[in-house]
Amino acid sequence: MTSTHHSRRSRETPQPEMSIGRYTRLDEIGRGSFATVYQGVHTKTRTYVAIKSVNLSKLNKKLKDNLSSEIHILKGLYHPHIVALIDCHETTSHIHLVMEYCALGDLSLFIKRRDTLGDHRYTRDMIAKYPNPPGGALNEVVVRHFLKQLASALKFLRDRNLIHRDIKPQNLLLCPSPSSYRSGVTQVVPFKGSEDSFNPATGLESLPLLKIADFGFARSLPATSLAETLCGSPLYMAPEILRYEKYDAKADLWSVGTVLYEMVVGKPPFRATNHVELLRKIEKGEDRIKFPEENPASDEIKALIRALLKRNPVERLNFPDFFQNGVITSPIPGLVADDLPSIPQGPPADPETAEATPRPDSRSGATVPGGTEREREGPSLPKGDTGLTQRPPSQNQRFGTPQTTTPMRRIGSGDRPPSTPKESTPPMTYPQRPSAVSHATAPGRQELVDRNATFTAMERQKGRNTFSEGSPQIDRQADKLREERERAAQDVAFERDYVVVEKRAVEVNAFADELAHSPRIQGNISRGAQTGALSRRSTVHGPTPSNPSPPQATVGKAMQVLSGRSRADSMHNRQGSYERRYGQSPTSATSAISKALNMASGRLFGMGFSPPLAITKGGRSPPLAYNPFPAYPAHGSLMIGDGAKSNLALDEDTKTVQILEECATRSDVVYGFAEVKYKQLVPLAPSVQTDPSSKLNLAGERENPDSADGGLTVDAIVTLSEEALVLYVKALSLLAKSMDIAGAWWARKNRGDGFGDSAMSRANGASTLAGTRINNVVQWIRNRFNEVLEKGEFVRLKLIEAQKRLPPDHPSHPDNHSVGSSLGSGASVDVVVSPGVSAEKLMYDRALEMSRTAAINELTGEDLSGCEIAYVTAIRMLEAVLENGEVPRFGQDKDDTSKDSDKIVLDAVQADERQVVIKLLTIQAVVASIRSRLAALRKKLAILAKRAPTPSANVPSKMASSNPVSVGATPPK
């Protein structure tokens, strides 16, 4: 599809030619995670195509099924501004997708090389007529031309209820101008996917032709997985996607705004080193889009960009208004005489009529050759394509405009006559595969629906559009709020294929949505809101969260925690998983667990594990009691502490809360350990360093800005990636178990032990509190699960990349991997870790190291409060090692599950390693020993606290409170 992105390997070693059907595969021109793109040529007509070869061994079953479904849909999409799928061939090892060839590459390269376009034979005339301004990127005539063609393609997709979801300059491919084909300037002639493939539906025929590429593959065949995309270049993603919020087709309009800005200015509107910083910049900008003073863009273009780049999708320009915008519908100003229309054609650039209006040159014999040959070829597509190669006229009509020309179609089976109105009587239907959704704000159900692509076009969207158009401006905001909330409960969200445990991710998010939006749970939350219960930050300007509102009023909102106590070091908003990672102050970059891990950390590869950050702003002060959960009413609050047995008689709901919180806390300890490894692989960006004036790396050495890996060797990267990956997988398993515990509780409630007049309305209110607390923990688990999934995928890709850089004789080099040593199930690419690397072994060694270091410090009287944290963390980590995947049965005492603990088998610890662990000491004995040390330490701390004078408000206390870790204590993240 592009001829400009030649890989270095293809230039050094020419690829052998290969016959694929009627085409010959030539040199490699691009490479992605799942596919390699080659230049190809038709064996008879010698016209060019792009051949995308997908390696089936890198796809799991779901990705293969989704790919087949998407190919079936793509064969029915024929539009001048969408790269067409011409043919498809499948072998035992690959699927070869034959697509239209775009000789000018993509728009990002076009903008980057704007200063040299005058030297290229395909763009020399364009620059002569419309030179690029010195203070901008592209001439506004060219910008409007590309925007019209992009809008035409989006209108075509919108009419078919399709969303691209990955609009960016890299996916906008360019072909030489249609006039250059007729004049003979263009020597590389592409094969035509349809009769009108290179006849523009709108815009100018003397300028390059824009086509959207990779449509549909965002769901079934991503160029990169979710984590890689977010950690790579999410510069064009809508903020609602970055926030893991509900999103719909309006996300495409944000992307259009970023592309339009880049065409005008020469760079994206928001740039950052990672998606966390990117989202922060978008939020900080508060919809104030600035342009360079010397930029010559017109006010009309700037106003359109500002209308598209609205953080709130409700405030963002909608599709009808976008398609009717003057920039889209009005003639392009500033045309040279040669490009002025010779005859009146009404609005010459209106996408509503341009596609149905015959062009003087659209049937010229001098157009791109290959179409007539296509008629002589006979069938070339696989079975089942007959119904897709002949398009009914009704699918080419725009906004009810009568069809006046031969419909745009692919001629693929002999000399087929043009479609007649009779052929359009049976409406074309496209089977829509079940969406792998993880609804962020509302429960959803996966269904297989055959949607009528002709006139059954998502009535809820049509209703939204007509509603917003016909409403007065004064009521527009309220009407949009109501309509967006109703639609948010139905539309598809997060249709992304996580490479790791994708199905589990869908289940986790679906259950969290169901619990969060249950009227019974929501009623409890609203009653407890005044005491600090969970509230929601509206993504739109709606009523304040504290006001009582119906349960559906929370749909489409993101999480926010309102702590019961106002404290300078604890006030924070939870918005997805990102802001917990990088807070707004240096204190939020760590936690008590991080401190405990740092205290026990040795030196690895000459680097420290993380910077020694102060817990609070006052320097040395009592460490905050660590707990990862949101703050909520603590009526008889359970104290997690160190997990020791309590003699209190607990009802079933309270037991569920206790077990759930303990399991989630163990997962958080493992997550904190994994973060130690992760932060070495991904050094902190300059904007989130604790000391802005310091440019030192984690080892205290001067940072090298040119070092992408922070100075780590390849062996170190492999080791860190392996350890981080197995720890993240362990954390995911604990989070999944926590969600299973909550799911079992919820199932029992739905079977009969309901809320309201029964269990949840007891006099002491314990069950009401339990429901609220379980919901809060479930929402935390959901956010953490998604975050760990994303980071785990990043580490997986980092590991695969680093292993390829190892010497060929290294045991971890991909060529030396055995089939049976791969990690993970269902992953698109198998991950192989070195023998002996397991999460349980790492956690066991770390727990022993932490407890021993804490014991030494306790004996010397140093940092007793830190010793307490280290003991608790070590206990939790060892409990996580002993954790199995079974959900506890209720009615069974917690201690009953550990009666057979001597028979526990550590799944990931190999036989020889298990023997080493057993020889040292049984884990249960280690836990008991650490608990005894912790009890003695707390007695010592209590005695010291009684003897010590009460510290003043300005002098932080050296010793911490002896109270166990409370559920309600939420440290800054």
From Swiss-Prot:
Q: What is its main location?
A: cytoplasm
One Pfam family of this chain: ATG1-like_MIT2
* Active site, per annotation: 166 (proton acceptor)
Instruction: Output compositional bias ranges, type Basic and acidic residues.
Output: 566-582
Q: Where does ATP bind?
A: 29-37, 52
Database matches in SUPFAM superfamilies: Protein kinase-like (PK-like)
EC numbers for this chain: 2.7.11.1
Q: Show the catalytic activity.
A: L-seryl-[protein] + ATP = O-phospho-L-seryl-[protein] + ADP + H(+); L-threonyl-[protein] + ATP = O-phospho-L-threonyl-[protein] + ADP + H(+)
Q: Which SMART domains match?
A: S_TKc
Which Gene3D superfamilies does this one have? Answer: Phosphorylase Kinase, domain 1 (3.30.200.20), Transferase(Phosphotransferase) domain 1 (1.10.510.10)
Quick one: a GO biological-process term for this protein?
piecemeal microautophagy of the nucleus
Q: Where is each Protein kinase domain found?
A: 23-328
InterPro entries associated with the record: Atg1-like, ATG1-like_MIT2, Atg1-like_tMIT, Kinase-like_dom_sf, Prot_kinase_dom, Protein_kinase_ATP_BS, Ser/Thr_kinase_AS
For the region Disordered, give the residue spans.
Answer: 338-446, 460-482, 523-587, 949-973
Subcellular localization, as worded in the UniProt entry: Cytoplasm; Preautophagosomal structure membrane
Q: Which GO terms describe its molecular function?
A: ATP binding; protein serine kinase activity; protein serine/threonine kinase activity
Q: Which GO terms describe its cellular component?
A: Atg1/ULK1 kinase complex; autophagosome; autophagosome membrane; cytoplasm; cytosol; phagophore; phagophore assembly site; phagophore assembly site membrane
Function, as annotated, reads: Serine/threonine protein kinase involved in the cytoplasm to vacuole transport (Cvt) and found to be essential in autophagy, where it is required for the formation of autophagosomes. Involved in the clearance of protein aggregates which cannot be efficiently cleared by the proteasome. Required for selective autophagic degradation of the nucleus (nucleophagy) as well as for mitophagy which contributes to regulate mitochondrial quantity and quality by eliminating the mitochondria to a basal level to fulfill cellular energy requirements and preventing excess ROS production.
Q: Which family does it belong to?
A: Belongs to the protein kinase superfamily. Ser/Thr protein kinase family. APG1/unc-51/ULK1 subfamily.
What quaternary structure, including any partners, is listed in this protein's UniProt entry?
Answer: Homodimer. Forms a ternary complex with ATG13 and ATG17.
PANTHER family in the record: NON-SPECIFIC SERINE_THREONINE PROTEIN KINASE, SERINE/THREONINE-PROTEIN KINASE UNC-51-RELATED
Q: What is the name of this protein? A: Serine/threonine-protein kinase atg1
Species of provenance: Aspergillus fumigatus (strain ATCC MYA-4609 / CBS 101355 / FGSC A1100 / Af293) (Neosartorya fumigata)
Source species taxonomy: Eukaryota, Fungi, Dikarya, Ascomycota, Pezizomycotina
